[in-house]
Amino acid sequence: MASILVSGGRKIVGTARVSGAKNAALPILAATLIARGPVELTDCPHLSDVENMLKILRSLGVSCSLEAGTAHIDAAKAERCIMPQSISKEIRSSIFMLGPLLGRFGRAVCTFPGGCEIGHRPIDLHLKGLMMLGADVREERGLIICEGRRLRGADIHLDYPSVGATENIMMAAACADGTTTVFNAAREPEIDDLARFLNELGYKIEGAGSSTITIRGGDAEEKKTTHRIIPDRIVAGTLMTAAAITGGELTLTNVNTEHIGSIAAKLKEAGSVITAGEGMLHISSPDRPNEIRLTETMPYPGFPTDMQAQLFALCTIAIGTSVIVENVFENRYRHAAELGRMGASFTQKDRTAIIRGVDKLTGARVKAWDLRGGAAMLLAGLSAEGETIIDHAELIDRGYDKLHETLNALGAQIIRKEN
């Protein structure tokens, strides 16, 4: 377990480079199982979730390493289709292995996936999609067993535009006979990045980024593939919010400004001035943010649920009253009570939080309940008067590569301790 000590009251000022996207890297790592040659992934973030995915790949017989932001993977000698329970139950992204394992071996076995406890996140859409492709899916003694020696293309209508289900179906359908069309598909940039990678392998994916994706089943080409992971829009949004909550001024490089439109819009509403250029962005913020009247989390291109906690932290010191509605997950306000320990004023019922901004927060001992909530605690600590201690800070490592070091380089004073 790790803890973080934040000394508040320092503005975030300077330049930072945005890392590769966690939510793009994880499904792409899974997709290397259906490559027919070595794969090199650049801008691959060094995160605990990425390390766990590499451990799963190694357990299946895949050769892989991650050094200096580049992952090297060769799945030529992969021979197992049963994922280790000890690892797969720790991270939700282990579910991404089902599609590629089915496509390559005709069989996949895993435990129910783990991850942050942020509400009910059913995997029924994943399993329903695989069944539509012809897989037999059953549960035995807490394990998910999928079998399908010959997957067949199908028309699949998703009840909800689930990112993970869309990605799993894409990977399995790439290896199936015939054409698969996914309707009501997720439109997130990470979907498009996975499609680009699959196309680079030699598969045929069209329509990614829209609500209808077509996958023409076939074989990958026998070749080496190099792919660059897209920039992480949530890391970018978190750093932008760090500048906004401290009244700072920040320049971000390696950022795709098209992917963060909804985040930038809310920070502009809070009073920040944002200018964008080719692969870069500059944000300059007032000493205290304005209220953000209403924010509702939505699937892309709406405001991302993965930025809700960070925006909540910003609203706690805003001039006026802000309202946030969490439409994606029903249990994603656990950070609210922790912010209350720091002096935040709010009421929360069901999916709606009404936040009344206070002049300043006060440092306190708080707990990170999940990845993004931990990031929100860190942001709140930056603006608070005095010192803030965040317990279970290791959860932040699931989505940020040494976030405390990045912020320290921008003027923060943060000390991390391993307990």
Named regions from a protein language model:
Residues M1-N419:
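Short, structured segments at the rim of ligand-binding sites
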